[in-house]
Amino acid sequence: MHIPESLQDLADSEAVQFLKRPKAITRIFAGVFSLIVFSSLLTDGYQNKTDNSELHCVLNSNSTACSIAVGAGLLAFLSSLAFLALDAHEVRLASTRFKTAFQLLDLILAVIWAGVWAVGFCFLANQWHRSPPRYFLLGSNSAKAAITFSFFSILVWIFQAYLAFQELRNDAPVPYKRSLDEGGVVLTSLSPPSAASPVNTPTTGPHGPSYASSSLSPYLSTPKAPRLAMMPDN
């Protein structure tokens, strides 16, 4: 294992360059926001009321709201970690079809998670708005943190979908590109010259190639037979 000897070597290392990519930064933010959502409700999201010791969800005593937020946050956190690990090995993918399928899956999941967090944010905000004030002793800060970072998760996953779409569009292979280029060259060379295209006409002077070929053509095309010479008698 190579240990960097200076800060410049550390900054130029492959791991640091990978973490500086916009896609990697976006996945890290998405994972951190998801971690805050499910951890805040998992720890302080269930509190007892002032009149009894039974635990209830701080979001309008609706256990479904807390369960959805915890489940969505946990799955989004694991999804961000999984795709971050796959991004690290993306350069080693030899198959172009597999790489395209991976980018398409990344785009689809980013759009799905953006929609999930949009619905979740609206649902959590609605349940918190319906919660009676000072109904629980603790847990209000956890509920506000979950709602806030649910909204931030919408923006992060939308940007992640945008990055995935740009990468898919830029890296999409064009089938038969070389064949089409070669066919275009052949058709261009066989097509008749247009009025706009320059036509190179050979010169007809004594030093031109057409003059030389015309002057040599009779000797090259019709060879003469040998003649018999008559010698006079002495």
From Swiss-Prot:
Subcellular location: Membrane
GO cellular component entries: neuromuscular junction; synaptic vesicle membrane
Keyword Membrane assigned: yes
Family statement drawn from the similarity comment of this UniProt entry: Belongs to the synaptogyrin family.
Segments for region (Disordered): 191-226
Source organism: Bos taurus (Bovine)
Ranges of compositional bias, category Low complexity: 209-221
Predominant location category: membrane
InterPro entries cross-referenced by the UniProt entry: Marvel, Synaptogyrin
PROSITE patterns: MARVEL
Gene giving rise to this polypeptide: SYNGR4
Membrane-crossing segments per the record: 25-45, 66-86, 104-124, 145-165
Membrane topology: Multi-pass membrane protein
Protein name from the UniProt record: Synaptogyrin-4
Domain named MARVEL: residues: 18-169
Keywords: Membrane, Transmembrane, Transmembrane helix
Domain of life: Eukaryota
Keyword Transport in annotation: no
